[in-house]
């Protein structure tokens, strides 16, 4: 048998990493296959912890300041599905940001939920997403019987919502708040802890420890931030949504990564912040990431541009010619993710790579609008309906069975159960002409309700 995946991984594994996972390919714990065990005598059971895993949960809870913390090995995706199931019942209205992660959209399908969308503020001139409008939030909860709200903070690019104000508004109406804090586990070990979801009073909080701090991919946590939900509630849904074969190596990596953060991570984060300040000074960094709808930007997310290149081109050039792996690139920006495991020398090499490019004009930003289409069916009803594949050009007035959106930025043009308009068809044409990937499009066809 050929081993194409192994061959490709070996090609890139030794390059400097400014992407996920947070361990950056460095040996931060004993990854010994002999430790890849199951639920035998003395090793406890993640789905009903009463021994060493329960003890570990208590240690994690102390670090994060939660009522209870629980390991999941299905990533933040699985943890979000647990949280959404805990907080809702079929047919409930749930408030979500339109630019939310696909796992939350899939949670709508799994739980047969009716989404009420919050527009995430989009700056057309900067092609950047920020926070949410508090007046719109108040209007949505006054005019809808909302069962729960799911927020994302920090976002992929590091913008942190004004969570205290938002959660206060929602809790005044007794609405449970779930925060997808997948990109924010490191906040609890920095001065930004005061902006974290648990400190802001969220009811359920999800962290991907593998994203920003050292642990293996799929390592995640779900926290109870309040007593709105019980330990029994959490355990019941963990048993439904978490695998019955949780990886002990993933669990051990969470333990090792959090131990590292507790012992060394705080001081290393301070050092990396200073390193990044030096890099930005050296390259005359002038991107304005501020907006009144966000309270802070995560300094461990580094968004930048190179003259004359798209972000995708920068990512490709870095990995081929600079031996540096970045997290992602879009039509305008490249994104690097820094963790405490990165070194000052690696950030120096990132600086030198950026300075190696000639000055020039940046790619012109094309302003875009992302209006929310009319909804005719609930997501689950649309998804389970009989469908047919047709050319997107012939889809005007049809109901979508899937998410169709531009990547970047990844926001749905149309989601499950929404009506495809002439405007959406024109948008798809525009994106394809600009070389932007359109998810949900297979060749030129999309799936609609028959």
Task: Please place each PLM-identified region on the residue numbering.
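Conserved C-terminal alpha-helix-loop-beta "cap" of PLP-dependent enzymes
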Residues: 284-416, 422-439
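Short glycine-rich or small-residue beta-strand-to-loop segments that form or flank ligand, phosphate
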Residues: 70-72, 149-152, 337
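N-terminal "arm"/small-domain region of PLP-dependent enzymes with the aminotransferase-like
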Residues: 1-51, 175
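Charge-dense polyanion-binding interfaces
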Residues: 437-450
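Conserved N-terminal alpha-helix of the aminotransferase class I/II PLP-enzyme fold
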Residues: 33, 37-75, 99
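General small-molecule cofactor/ligand-binding pocket signal
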Residues: 70, 116-118, 327
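Conserved PLP-enzyme active-site core in the AAT-like
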Residues: 2-8, 27-29, 76-289, 306
């Amino acid at each position: 048998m050929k081993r194409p995946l192994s061959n490709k991984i070996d090609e890139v594994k030794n390059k400097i990493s400014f992407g996920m996972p947070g361990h950056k390919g460095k040996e931060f714990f004993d990854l010994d296959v002999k430790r890849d065990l199951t639920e035998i005598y003395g090793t406890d059971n993640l789905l009903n912890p009463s021994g060493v895993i329960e003890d570990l949960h208590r240690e994690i809870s102390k670090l994060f300041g939660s009522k209870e913390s629980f390991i999941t090995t299905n990533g933040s995706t699985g943890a979000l599905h647990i949280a959404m199931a805990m907080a809702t019942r079929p047919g409930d209205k749930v408030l979500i940001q339109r630019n939310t992660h696909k796992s939350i959209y899939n949670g709508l399908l799994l739980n047969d939920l009716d989404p009420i969308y919050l527009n995430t503020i989009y700056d057309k001139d900067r092609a950047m997403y920020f926070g949410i409008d508090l007046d719109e939030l108040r209007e949505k909860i006054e005019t809808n019987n909302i069962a729960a709200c799911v927020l994302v903070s920090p976002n992929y690019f590091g913008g942190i919502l004004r969570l205290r104000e938002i959660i206060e508004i929602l809790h005044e109406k007794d609405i449970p708040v779930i925060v997808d804090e997948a990109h924010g586990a490191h906040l609890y070990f920095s001065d930004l802890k005061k902006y974290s979801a648990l400190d802001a009073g969220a009811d359920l909080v999800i962290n991907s420890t593998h994203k920003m701090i050292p642990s293996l991919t799929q390592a995640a946590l779900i926290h109870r931030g309040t007593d709105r939900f019980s330990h029994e509630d959490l355990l019941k849904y963990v048993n439904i949504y978490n695998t019955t074969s949780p990886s002990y190596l993933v669990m051990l990596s969470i333990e090792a990564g959090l131990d590292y953060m507790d012992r060394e991570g705080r001081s290393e984060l301070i050092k990396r912040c200073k390193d990044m300040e030096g890099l930005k000074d050296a390259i005359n960094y002038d991107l304005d990431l501020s907006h009144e709808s966000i309270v802070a930007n995560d300094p461990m997310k580094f968004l930048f541009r190179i003259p004359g290149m798209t972000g995708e081109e920068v990512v490709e050039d870095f990995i081929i010619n600079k031996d540096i792996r970045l997290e992602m690139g879009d039509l305008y920006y490249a994104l690097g993710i820094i963790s405490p495991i990165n070194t000052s020398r690696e950030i120096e090499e990132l600086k030198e790579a950026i300075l190696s490019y000639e000055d020039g004009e940046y790619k012109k930003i094309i302003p875009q609008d992302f209006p929310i289409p009319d909804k005719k069916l609930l997501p689950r009803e649309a998804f389970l309906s009989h469908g047919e594949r047709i050319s997107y050009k012939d889809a005007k007035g049809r109901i979508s069975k899937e998410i169709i959106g531009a990547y970047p930025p990844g926001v749905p043009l149309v989601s499950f159960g929404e009506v495809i308009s002439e405007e959406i068809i024109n948008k798809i044409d525009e994106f394809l002409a600009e070389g932007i990937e359109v998810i949900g499009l297979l060749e030129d066809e999309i799936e609609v309700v028959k």
